[in-house]
Amino acid sequence: GTTCQYGLLDSFDLSRKIHDRFYKGYESVKLPHKFKIAVGGCPNNCVKPNLNDLGVVGQRIPGFQADICRGCKVCQVENTCPVHAAKVVDGVLKIDPNLCNNCGRCIGTCPFKAMPTGEYGYRIYIGGRWGKKYAHGKPLDPVFTSEEEVMQVIEKAILLFREQGKTGERFSDTIERLGFENVQSQLLGSELL
C-alpha cells in the first residue's frame, strides 16, 4: 500500500489513473449530478469508499490449501483473523465467505504453509453518499482481479448514470429507482460499452 501497512494496492496510482481517464478525459460529459469516486487501500475503510457514488477497495483473497491444513488446536490463521471468519472445525480450517472481508491479514501466518498466498483484487461499491442524505454503497458481487476490469466498471457506471439518471438525481437515487440487481447486471454486462 501507499499510505499504511494494511494497504493492498497503490491507492495513489489508481486514483491518478481514474482522475486522468474520467475527470480529465470525461470533462465534457454532462452527468445528472456530481459523481464522486474514492479509492481505499484495504477493507479497513479509512477513506470510506462505500460512502461515495463509486468506491474501490483493495482486497487480498486468501489462497487456503485444505490438504496441507493440520487443524492445529491453536491455529495462527484463526487467531490472526480480525473479523473471525476463520475457524478450525472438525480438525480443518474453514473460512466463512460471508464474514471474510479479504483483508489478507491471515496470509502467510500458517507455519505449515496452508495459507501461503492470496490473490490481490478490488471490491467495487456503488451508490454511496453522505451529507444531508446518506446511503451505504453496496458491493458488486465479484471481486475484480485486474485494474482494467475496475476501469471498465467505472466507465460503465458513468455511462449508465449519464443515460439513465435524471437531472439533479444522485447516483444512489438512480440505483434505487432502477434496482440494484438491474444496475449490477448492466455494469457486469457488455451493453454499456
Residue ranges and their predicted role:
Residues S28-K34, V89, E163-R177, L193:
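Flexible, glycine/charged-enriched surface loops at secondary-structure junctions
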Residues V74-K94, N101, R105-G121:
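Iron-sulfur cluster-binding cysteine motifs and their immediate structural context
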Residues N182-L193:
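C-terminal, charged low-complexity interaction regions
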Residues Y120, G128-G165:
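A hydrophobic, small-residue-rich beta->alpha segment in the mid-to-C-terminal subdomain
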Residues L54-G58, Y122-W130:
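Short beta-strand elements
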Residues T3-L14, P142-E149, E163, S172-I175:
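Catalytic cores of large soluble enzymes that bind and process phosphate-bearing ligands
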Residues G1-V74, T80, K94, N98-L99:
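Small-residue-enriched alpha-helical segments and adjacent helix-cap loops
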Residues D10, L14-I18, F22, V77, ...:
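General structural feature for long, well-ordered alpha-helical segments within catalytic domains
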